[in-house]
């Protein structure tokens, strides 16, 4: 192991694997290590027996739930926007040749105590039971404005500079109601709070356009895609990619200790008495605990069920967003469900997650509004984990630390962190202009 690398990556979570892949493709010499004997770190994927061991402390799950290996339960389940940045990153690295994607059936939102399909186009707005007849027209006009908006063509701006006008002022022009503003901001533009209302509208409009374009791509009921066999496939695909570019992966390396020189800059990583030298370290917060701070906790429930989520048109895979205001909370709640259709459970079984930022000392109670939407469950597990963010100055120590995964069930925030880290590490922006058709292998099935 006494070699020299340009970058050593610690942890095989999604963010670390994507960065390791991007840096390998850029021609850097990368060593990738993990203290665990499995891929994925916090974002690993468990079979049924592993799930049982983690949450129940028993070696084997009951036989009536089916074969353990038919389950691939992602610990950080997140859907990908079909035309989104993550898919572009995957195509950029060509890792898509190791993965098969399938469209997700449904995209729903919880408004006024009901689960409703998220309308994202003028046509859908007119059909949506979310709004009365006059509100439908107003929303339809707003969606048309968004659809036609082109920054380079002032004729589509309606006299507004969206880099200066706030989202609140733009929406006021169309006279939309609170609930409509709520589902547009949280379930279409995928904002996690209401700060966007006081920021320039450009970002929200571009997010809405991305949603509508992704939706149109697969002619399905949602703008999302998900890999067959779940996200656990991603770290392994990146390990294969890294090998193609001469990168090295090592699992089961205990006590990966980051070494520093007299100036406080990274000089290498020691494991089992051997030190690999390097100029930069990329890692998750668990490898450099003295350079991160706690920023909150995520509470989640994991359910095994024998039916799809009620009121979602029997969707075999679905996301339901519960905006904070609808629950009288400070943060949104997310429901994620997947099944045999993505090969993450045996036929007839569904895996559902409910997640949110914990706001009290009783997170199980906080999750109840989301759990209530699931209907009867066969098994229910609760989990809570701390979230951390880096507090170091990477220009001084050459340590590039990812932020812990949040409660969202889509990749929006994750990929923003990855792209920011890539820029810090390399000093350049990642070029995301790619042919999106490269990630569409399985959607015709």
UniProtKB/Swiss-Prot annotation:
Organs and tissues of expression: Expressed in roots, rosette leaves, stems, floral buds and siliques.
Pfam families assigned: GDI (PF00996)
Leader sequence residues: none
Annotated InterPro entries: FAD/NAD-bd_sf, GDP_dissociation_inhibitor, RabGDI
MF GO annotations: GTPase activator activity; Rab GDP-dissociation inhibitor activity
Keywords assigned by UniProt, alphabetized: GTPase activation
Residue pairs linked by disulfide bridges in the UniProt entry: none
Origin superkingdom: Eukaryota
GO cellular component: cytosol
GO-annotated biological processes: protein transport; small GTPase-mediated signal transduction
PANTHER family reported in the protein's UniProt record: RAB GDP DISSOCIATION INHIBITOR (PTHR11787:SF8), RAB GDP-DISSOCIATION INHIBITOR (PTHR11787)
Record's function text: Regulates the GDP/GTP exchange reaction of most RAB proteins by inhibiting the dissociation of GDP from them, and the subsequent binding of GTP.
Subunit structure: Interacts with the GDP-bound form of RABA5C (via C-terminus).
Family: Belongs to the Rab GDI family.
Protein name in UniProt: Guanosine nucleotide diphosphate dissociation inhibitor 1
Organism for this UniProt entry: Arabidopsis thaliana (Mouse-ear cress)
